[in-house]
Amino acid sequence: MTLEEKIIEIIVDQLEVTAEECVPEASFINDLGADSLDLAELLLEMEDTFDVEISTEDLKKIRKIQDVIDYLKVRNVTWD
């Protein structure tokens, strides 16, 4: 499973959307219907899964699926 596939799996589970809706340019709020609490829970799950801490400053910049992919790739994350 690639990093992108794992991210999409988490998004599908957390936001109860379909994998088809999870295109890189999809906005969590505008396209996937997430609210601020959903987004916070989603990013907490990402932190736990990928053993990375997302700073408050970085949280403000994550609005789309591609933002998460880019953020995690730069940090060379792995998961079990």
Swiss-Prot record:
Carrier of the growing fatty acid chain in fatty acid biosynthesis. One of its GO terms (molecular function) is acyl carrier activity. The modification O-(pantetheine 4'-phosphoryl)serine is found at S36. Belongs to the acyl carrier protein (ACP) family. Pathway: Lipid metabolism; fatty acid biosynthesis. It holds the Pfam family PP-binding. 4'-phosphopantetheine is transferred from CoA to a specific serine of apo-ACP by AcpS. This modification is essential for activity because fatty acids are bound in thioester linkage to the sulfhydryl of the prosthetic group. It comes from the Bacteria. Keywords: Cytoplasm, Fatty acid biosynthesis, Fatty acid metabolism, Lipid biosynthesis, Lipid metabolism, Phosphopantetheine, Phosphoprotein. SUPFAM superfamilies: ACP-like. GO terms for cellular component: cytosol; membrane. It comes from Syntrophus aciditrophicus (strain SB). This is Acyl carrier protein. Residues 1-76 form the Carrier domain. One of its GO terms (biological process) is lipid A biosynthetic process. It is found in: Cytoplasm.
